[in-house]
Amino acid sequence: MEVILLERVAKLGQMGDVVKVKHGFARNFLLKRGKALRATAENRTKYDGMKAELEINNIKAKGEAAKVAEKIDGRDIVIIRQASETGQLFGSVTVRDIVAALAEDGITVSRPQVWLDAPIKTIGQQKLTVAVHPEVEAHVMVTVARSADEAERIKRGEDISTRREDRDAAAEAIAAAGEFFDPEAEPDDVAEAGGEQTAEEK
């Protein structure tokens, strides 16, 4: 289906462009949200008559969006979730969760404005784009952690999984050393034991 865009649409075109899209996308998104008109002869004439007004409205909306973007850009949103020892979430963080977290911060955006390729399924950080306006974008950092303390460590750049592995390795080393060392042994006993071992080795 060919449509006339009434505003800039990411990865599709600018205001006034005639583009070809799938019927479902046109009906369920572009036409439904007032972002486009069917590219009929009648609508082409209609667009020509409303072009000036659309451009004025777009400039106003863009200015307001820029103010909102200033409040959003650079925000660090923390979302606490349960996860396994390996950092795999028991569930996932979706656009709905991010929109809700922004709302708690006093920022209202709709789900289509948040660009998330796939649900977040592990702890860590991810930078996301929020399309405040077709021509204005802001960026937020989403930190997913098991606790507020862990979120702070992630923000500091600590590798949570590596820290846990290091602790496990250290514990194993201590346990292994304990098999060859008796803390209750007398110094002479230790020396004798060492001497016997050396003799056996020879």
Swiss-Prot record:
Provide GO CC annotations from the record: ribonucleoprotein complex; ribosome
**Molecular-function GO terms, alphabetical:** rRNA binding; structural constituent of ribosome
Give UniProt keywords alphabetically.
Ribonucleoprotein, Ribosomal protein, RNA-binding, rRNA-binding
Q: What gene does the UniProt entry assign to this protein?
A: rplI
Listed InterPro entries: Ribosomal_bL9, Ribosomal_bL9/RNase_H1_N, Ribosomal_bL9_bac/chp, Ribosomal_bL9_C, Ribosomal_bL9_C_sf, Ribosomal_bL9_N, Ribosomal_bL9_N_sf
Protein family:
Belongs to the bacterial ribosomal protein bL9 family.
Cysteines joined through disulfide linkages? none
Give a yes or no for keyword Ribonucleoprotein in this entry: yes
Q: What is this protein called?
A: Large ribosomal subunit protein bL9
Q: Where is the composition biased (Acidic residues)?
A: 181-191
Q: Which PROSITE patterns match?
A: RIBOSOMAL_L9
Region annotated Disordered sits at 177-202
Function in brief: Binds to the 23S rRNA.
Mark the transmembrane ranges.
none
| A Pfam entry, by short name | Ribosomal_L9_C
Q: Which organism is it from?
A: Nitrobacter hamburgensis (strain DSM 10229 / NCIMB 13809 / X14)
- Biological processes per GO annotation: translation
